[in-house]
Curated annotation (Swiss-Prot):
It is found in: Cell membrane. PANTHER family: ATP SYNTHASE LIPID-BINDING PROTEIN, MITOCHONDRIAL (PTHR10031), ATPASE PROTEIN 9 (PTHR10031:SF0). F-type ATPases have 2 components, F(1) - the catalytic core - and F(0) - the membrane proton channel. F(1) has five subunits: alpha(3), beta(3), gamma(1), delta(1), epsilon(1). F(0) has three main subunits: a(1), b(2) and c(10-14). The alpha and beta chains form an alternating ring which encloses part of the gamma chain. F(1) is attached to F(0) by a central stalk formed by the gamma and epsilon chains, while a peripheral stalk is formed by the delta and b chains. GO terms for molecular function: lipid binding; proton-transporting ATP synthase activity, rotational mechanism. GO terms for cellular component: plasma membrane; proton-transporting ATP synthase complex; proton-transporting two-sector ATPase complex, proton-transporting domain. Pfam families: ATP-synt_C. The record marks 54 as: Reversibly protonated during proton transport. Keywords: ATP synthesis, Cell membrane, CF(0), Hydrogen ion transport, Ion transport, Lipid-binding, Membrane, Transmembrane, Transmembrane helix, Transport. The chain crosses the membrane at residues 4-24, 47-67. F(1)F(0) ATP synthase produces ATP from ADP in the presence of a proton or sodium gradient. F-type ATPases consist of two structural domains, F(1) containing the extramembraneous catalytic core and F(0) containing the membrane proton channel, linked together by a central stalk and a peripheral stalk. During catalysis, ATP synthesis in the catalytic domain of F(1) is coupled via a rotary mechanism of the central stalk subunits to proton translocation. This is ATP synthase subunit c.
């Protein structure tokens, strides 16, 4: 049962991160197209946002390993 729960947790975290990253990047491209002079600021903010979104799947993997180890 723990193996199935781990797989579901990792899969949903990866799905959410993929959707979140897609939204972040698309809005950054949209903002750059509207205001090209803000490209540097938008890009740096995009990388911060992507890093925060990617932290959740990493935490999910750690928790999944903890559930499997019990």
């Amino acid at each position: 049962m723990g193996l199935i729960a781990s797989a579901i947790a990792i899969g949903l975290a990866a799905l959410g991160a993929g959707i979140g990253n897609g939204l972040i990047v698309s809005k950054t491209i949209e903002g750059t197209a509207r205001q090209p002079e803000a490209r540097g600021t938008l890009t740096s903010m995009m990388f911060v946002g992507v890093a925060l979104v990617e932290a959740l799947p990493i935490i999910a993997v750690v928790i999944a390993f903890m559930v499997q180890g019990k």
